[in-house]
Amino acid sequence: MNISVITVCFNSKDDLRKTLDSVLSQTYVDMEYLVVDGGSRDGSVDLLRAYESKFKAKGISFRFVSEKDKGTYDAMNKGAMMAKGMWINYMNAGDTFYRNDTLVRFFSHNIEVDAGVVFGNTCQVFDFGTGIAKYEDYLKDNPVMPFCHQSCFVLTTLMQHYKFDMSYRIVADHDLFYRLHTDGVKYQYIDEVVASYNGQYGLSATNPLLLRKEGLRIHHVNEKWYYPLALLWVYMRYGWIQPFKNCMPKCMSDAWMKHKRKYIKN
């Protein structure tokens, strides 16, 4: 088995259905699909049971668990420990593959034998338009995590060893890839669009202050003598952004976000 696609969810039945349909529509079948549900009470478990026969008919191994957990990253770690495939991809509730043949196209490329992380591009969806983020362009500026987790595949052995640090609220993925990069794990870029996800309402987009504050921890700035100054700078630069955006008319907020993402098309 080559790929383990993992979805984590909690009380997000409608978003979950969207992701289930996307995975089920893949023309690539050398994979398993794992869903880790946090004990939902909105009918998500009944939905998962209804899809079991559909995945079986497609020839895709399908397993799910529904139990209380300690949050998103705990669920993602559980999924990794369940995985039997060579590569892990996290496609969480509401996320989708870009095309029905995404996995076929992606894995038709030559994967280097020493690559530990393989990643592609992402279609980001906003209220005001969509656009393709080509992550090759970000490699020089951000060699640690120049992609979103939906568009990358990590060796299962690495995920099971490193795991997500659950002390982070929203940047445990950044921390994990920082550790992988620091330890010399090889990244490989493939010029294919892998995933589509909503870039407007994600945790990082709506929590810029927490994003930067936790980022200081990742880079161990919190252990330096100048940490109070760095923290003050973060608060001065980012502390006002979300409150200000909340007070802005939506058209102005969208225009500002679009200006920062020039690849977005109406």
Where are these regions (language model features)?
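Membrane-proximal basic amphipathic "stem/tether" segments
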Residues: 220-266
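Solvent-exposed, non-transmembrane amphipathic alpha-helical segments
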Residues: 99, 174, 178-179, 214-217, ...
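Nucleotide-sugar donor-binding/catalytic module of glycosyltransferases
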Residues: 1-205
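Short alpha-helix boundary/capping motifs
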Residues: 187, 208, 243-247
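Catalytic core of nucleotide-sugar-dependent glycosyltransferases
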Residues: 193, 205-229
